[in-house]
Amino acid sequence: MTQLDLTIAGVGGQGSILAGVILGSAAVNYDGKYAVQTQAYSSELRGGFAATWVIISDKPILFPRVTRPDILIAQAQDSISRFADTLKPEGSLIIDADMVHRIPQGVNRIYEVHATTAAHQKLKSPVTANMIVLGALCRITEVVSRGALEKAISA
């Protein structure tokens, strides 16, 4: 991996931005990589748009903005509508299959994770679905090590 650009998007209250902060922390503090994290959200406390953009690299990051992500993590259907067209043609889409039901055509690699169901059944808290999605990202891409991700979550 030289550099991975990703977008994590959902609605307010799902923890999309927190997931980006934790991912960046795992990369920098525990795996010795470079990372940049930016975010945007609407004014609603819950239910509005929320997204984070993360760049992780083995080398210094010269331009700190994601324009064409390698990976889009969609935690809500609205995330697909907003960001699917920004995904690189060879990019990957990771969805919370409990929340996203319509997938756009033309995406070559799609990973479905039933994160909300798993969070509710195993952890008794659907708000932890963001951490389950991060675990899936880590397993699929190895962008950060499992140990680094676990330490960043615990920190």
Over which residues does each language-model region extend?
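Active-site cofactor/cluster-binding pocket
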Residues: 1-155
